[in-house]
């Protein structure tokens, strides 16, 4: 029996370093940033969900399920993740940010393999040097744990996942896979790098 895997793309932040522009809709090489993430992720999952706290009508062109955080107040990525876990019927949920346009095309396969091999609750990607806390594959059954963590006033993803059995999956062979774009200058730099 194969597992159903859905993905949620997190686009719910305030994007302060992007001058308040909605990062997922900022264009990179003529396409919104989120479209780059979708192109990389779509073949790897059954359904894509988008967590967005603004411009939901614009995001609706990219996914059937677009939703805001259950708890208003921009509580960070965990708030989007906990909401997504309540909306999916999947066995596993892939979480990725909207501002990572170069995600690995073998992300799900490698993370699912590590999750199974290590009998872990979740898998977190690493660039070989640093863990990427907002790139993870997890069981939606962890929702209650995450809700309790948020209710206690906690916000840091890595503090939450440290409470569970975690498989860290290295993508050192793809050093630019998790390049994320936070400022207009970084958009320009990445545009140049991708067209060289």
Swiss-Prot record:
Ligand binding (GTP): 10-12, 23, 51, 69, 99
Binding site for Mg(2+): 99
Any one biological process term the GO annotation gives: bis(molybdopterin guanine dinucleotide)molybdenum biosynthetic process
EC number: 2.7.7.77
Cell compartment(s), UniProt: Cytoplasm
Function field: Transfers a GMP moiety from GTP to Mo-molybdopterin (Mo-MPT) cofactor (Moco or molybdenum cofactor) to form Mo-molybdopterin guanine dinucleotide (Mo-MGD) cofactor.
Name of the featured protein: Molybdenum cofactor guanylyltransferase
Lineage per the UniProt record: Bacteria, Pseudomonadati, Pseudomonadota, Gammaproteobacteria, Alteromonadales
């Amino acid at each position: 029996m194969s597992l159903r895997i859905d993905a949620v793309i997190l686009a719910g932040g305030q994007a302060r370093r992007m001058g308040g522009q909605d990062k997922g809709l900022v264009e990179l090489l003529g396409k919104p940033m989120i479209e780059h993430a979708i192109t990389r992720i779509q073949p790897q999952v059954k359904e894509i969900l988008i967590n967005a706290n603004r411009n939901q009508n614009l995001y609706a062109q990219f996914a059937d399920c677009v939703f805001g955080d259950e708890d208003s107040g921009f509580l960070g990525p965990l708030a989007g993740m906990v909401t997504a876990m309540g909306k999916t019927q999947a066995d596993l949920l892939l979480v990725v940010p909207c501002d990572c346009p170069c995600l690995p095309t073998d992300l799900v396969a490698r993370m699912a393999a590590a999750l199974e091999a290590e009998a872990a609750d979740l898998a977190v990607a690493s660039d070989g040097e640093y863990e990427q806390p907002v790139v993870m594959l997890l069981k939606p059954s962890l929702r209650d744990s995450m809700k309790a963590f948020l209710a206690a006033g906690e916000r840091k993803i890595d503090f939450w996942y440290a409470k569970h059995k975690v498989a860290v999956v290295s993508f050192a062979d793809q050093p630019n896979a998790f390049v994320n774009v936070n400022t207009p200058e970084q958009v320009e730099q990445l545009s140049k790098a991708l067209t060289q």
